[in-house]
């Protein structure tokens, strides 16, 4: 047990013994159910050493497991070595879930502890019900991080800033009015908002408290008569204070949220999103509660014309930055550059634009077999040195004041094999099929998912991640309410939604291939008999790798689609490029 996190595991067990806790469940999130929590809340990482964005650690007095999905199997296997944790694979036949495993290993009357601040009401209720059914005790206030994490990073105190209404396309009064309309329709008096991206969108605020997502850590409460933001005072600049005052938003201390909720009249009804509000906050409320999805999610998911224009501008910046990075990569691939150098170079190119605010997630630059690790994150220690051969998968995104980007390209660094070209073309065919889809109003993502997977399925292959996720406007790179995946999601695709299109194939020990563009849902046609039909507009601006295409596998329709896309990329990016850069791009986009 040589790994440095192992002493942390033993310290946790010592605390468990002293508190008579037999098992503890540790998620990888924060009190806001954030995809990317601040360092202050990464207790799971501290105990286990696993750093993936999805994963749950479970510790008993004599065993420990880390549950994660297929995106992180290879990463987790490496990071958990010597940690005292066993990798447990989610959604794999024969593998027990967290609760199934606890049911097998715990004795009757065992006590299962959680930090109720980190579990949504639905999750906590599920664990509590499981405990009751199995004769276990449920302890929802086991706060281990405060007790054993001696060098815990402080809660971030970065200043918030106002997101310009000219970029947001709607002022705070208008947004809150629409939320209040949703409350009236649900016979609710108020709405508790805990998700950071919802608060940022609703109040036109942004921040830098969380890596990759420009949000500020806060809570909010909204009703017809009251607007309250719970935030650390250190984050409130004069500009932010004036902005909130203009829209009648009161400011209270971040830590006063439970006290405030406890004072809401017992006759009032507050709308609570059980998938986002924590168990700790839910238990603090004595008022009536109506459980339903926050109306902010749906409102935020449909972009207005200003936001769409911003997305298009961000794609121009990002496409030009990609061109410059790729030119540099081609010129230096034989000079000993690494996966990390690719990451740094693209950050440098993006930063040349004044509105850039960093990346929208940690770049995945996976060379050769590293590309088969779906959410691989290179470090200076793990990074491969590139050479003029093999495949390089680059999945990256930028944050700009105008919008958020997310793009994946797989490129050949030289001499692609027949197998690489075959697999690349299969992925491209699925990607193209989804991009050219026309579908009736009311269609859900699950109904379109097969378009992207079909070419792989025809050859007995698949991928285990989703095909598409929503993307925020200068917010989270991954958001809802829509998705395109095999699992059912009742949310239909609506006009103005921005969704990713990213099929992939991963061959362990060999390579990974993924191709991703962002798609905007736009009108296609309508008629009296059949109603409205929608289609997609590809927002992302960067060419596919034509050297990896097996032309015998492409139809005339697909060839035309590729050529039309490449012509658009050239036309739109050319004004941002130098003569040499434009010439490079035109070569990459020449007709096939």
Residue locations for each model-derived region?
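Active-site neighborhoods and metal-handling regions in enzymes and metal-associated proteins
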Residues: 1-592
């Amino acid at each position: 047990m040589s790994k440095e996190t192992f002493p942390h595991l033993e310290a946790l067990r010592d605390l468990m013994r002293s508190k008579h806790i037999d098992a503890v469940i540790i998620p990888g999130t924060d009190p806001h159910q954030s995809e990317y929590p601040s360092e202050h809340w990464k207790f799971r990482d501290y105990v286990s050493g696993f750093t993936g964005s999805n994963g749950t650690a479970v510790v008993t007095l004599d065993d420990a497991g880390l549950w994660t999905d297929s995106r992180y199997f290879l990463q987790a296997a490496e990071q958990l070595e010597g940690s005292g944790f066993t990798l447990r694979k989610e959604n794999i036949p024969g593998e027990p879930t967290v609760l199934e495993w606890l049911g097998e290993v715990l004795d009757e009357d065992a006590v299962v502890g959680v930090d109720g601040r980190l579990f949504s009401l639905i999750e906590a209720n599920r664990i509590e019900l499981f405990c009751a059914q199995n004769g276990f005790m449920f302890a929802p206030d086991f706060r281990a991080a405060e007790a054993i994490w001696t060098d815990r990073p402080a809660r971030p105190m970065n200043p918030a800033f106002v997101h310009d209404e000219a970029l947001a396309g709607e002022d705070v009064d208008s947004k809150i009015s629409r939320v209040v309309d949703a409350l009236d329709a649900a016979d609710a008096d108020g709405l508790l908002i805990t998700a950071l991206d919802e608060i940022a969108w609703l109040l036109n605020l942004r921040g830098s408290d969380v890596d990759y997502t420009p949000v500020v850590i806060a809570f909010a409460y909204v009703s017809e008569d009251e607007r309250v933001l719970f935030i650390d005072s250190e984050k409130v600049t004069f500009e932010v204070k004036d902005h909130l005052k203009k829209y009648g938003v009161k400011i209270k201390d971040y830590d006063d949220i439970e006290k405030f909720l406890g004072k809401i009249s017992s006759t009032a009804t507050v709308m609570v999103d059980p998938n986002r509000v924590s168990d700790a906050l839910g238990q603090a409320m004595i008022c009536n509660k109506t459980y339903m999805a926050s109306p902010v999610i749906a409102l935020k998911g449909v972009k207005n014309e200003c936001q769409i224009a911003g997305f298009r501008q961000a794609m121009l910046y990002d496409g030009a930055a990609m061109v410059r990075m790729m030119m540099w990569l081609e010129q230096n691939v034989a000079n000993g550059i690494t996966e990390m150098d690719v990451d740094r170079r693209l950050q440098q190119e993006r930063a040349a634009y004044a509105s850039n605010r960093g990346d929208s997630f940690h770049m995945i630059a996976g060379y050769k077999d590293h590309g088969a690790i779906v959410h691989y994150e290179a470090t200076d220690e793990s990074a491969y040195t590139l050479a003029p051969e093999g495949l390089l998968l680059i999945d990256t995104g930028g944050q700009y004041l105008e919008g958020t980007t997310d793009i994946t390209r797989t490129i050949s660094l030289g001499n692609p094999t027949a197998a690489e070209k075959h697999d690349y073309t299969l992925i491209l065919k699925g990607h193209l099929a989804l991009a050219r889809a026309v579908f009736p109003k009311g269609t859900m993502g699950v109904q379109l998912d097969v378009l992207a997977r079909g070419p792989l399925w025809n050859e007995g292959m698949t991928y285990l991640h989703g095909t598409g996720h929503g993307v925020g406007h200068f917010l989270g790179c991954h958001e809802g309410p829509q998705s395109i995946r095999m699992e059912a999601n009742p949310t239909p695709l609506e006009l103005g939604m921005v969704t990713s299109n990213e099929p992939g194939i991963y061959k362990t020990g060999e390579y990974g291939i993924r191709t991703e563009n962002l798609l905007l849902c736009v009108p296609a046609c309508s008629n009296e008999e059949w109603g409205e039909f929608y289609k997609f507009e590809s927002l992302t601006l960067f060419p596919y790798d034509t050297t990896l295409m097996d032309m015998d596998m492409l139809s005339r329709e697909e060839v035309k689609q590729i050529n039309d896309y490449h012509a658009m990329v050239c036309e739109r990016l050319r004004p941002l490029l130098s003569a040499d850069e434009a010439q490079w791009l035109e070569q990459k986009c020449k007709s096939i």
